Amino acid sequence: METMGRHVISELWGCDFDKLNDMDFIEKTFVNAALKSGAEVREVAFHKFAPQGVSGVVIISESHLTIHSFPEHGYASIDVYTCGDLDPNVAADYIADALHADTRENIEIPRGMGPVQIKQAQAKVL
């Protein structure tokens, strides 16, 4: 059975505090990441928390990109889910680079193939 989608869960550590706390920067980064991967952006929604942190989603024709940032820990939780021929790692890597992550761990899960099959996690210290 062919996969219906690819879901990358990305754990980003050692990120820049100011970038993780800047909603406009994160929104632009996520839209650019989607476009760089070849996706078609449909909707964008982000929220800035007090005293810090940003959560948001970019809905793409091919699925979505999400973030929950924790600037006080230098940490961001990222999800990139794509359908079709798009590679979610393109967007995930773009985001990690933009946030200046020191360490990233990506787990890719093929979606729509029956029982969940988690591919080997890939961790990079940058």
From Swiss-Prot:
Name the pathway it acts in: Amine and polyamine biosynthesis; S-adenosylmethioninamine biosynthesis; S-adenosylmethioninamine from S-adenosyl-L-methionine: step 1/1
UniProt entry tagged with the keyword S-adenosyl-L-methionine = yes
Positions of transmembrane segments: none
Q: Which reaction does it catalyse?
A: S-adenosyl-L-methionine + H(+) = S-adenosyl 3-(methylsulfanyl)propylamine + CO2
E.C. no? 4.1.1.50
- The active site annotation covers 63 (schiff-base intermediate with substrate), 68 (proton acceptor), 83 (proton donor)
- Respond yes or no to whether keyword S-adenosyl-L-methionine is given for this record: yes
InterPro entries hit by this protein:
AdoMetDC_C, AdoMetDC_fam_prok, AdoMetDC_N, S-AdoMet_deCO2ase_core, S-AdoMet_deCOase_pro-enz
* Cofactor or coenzyme needed: pyruvate
Pfam families assigned: AdoMet_dc (PF02675)
User: Which GO terms of type biological process are on file?
Assistant: spermidine biosynthetic process
Per the UniProt record, the site (Cleavage (non-hydrolytic)) maps to 62-63
Q: How is the cofactor bound?
A: Binds 1 pyruvoyl group covalently per subunit.
User: Family assignment?
Assistant: Belongs to the prokaryotic AdoMetDC family. Type 1 subfamily.
What function does this protein fulfil? Catalyzes the decarboxylation of S-adenosylmethionine to S-adenosylmethioninamine (dcAdoMet), the propylamine donor required for the synthesis of the polyamines spermine and spermidine from the diamine putrescine.
Q: Fill in the subunit field for this protein.
A: Heterotetramer of two alpha and two beta chains arranged as a dimer of alpha/beta heterodimers.
Q: What's the protein here called?
A: S-adenosylmethionine decarboxylase proenzyme
What organism does the record attribute this protein to? Bacillus velezensis (strain DSM 23117 / BGSC 10A6 / LMG 26770 / FZB42) (Bacillus amyloliquefaciens subsp. plantarum)
Q: Which gene encodes it?
A: speH
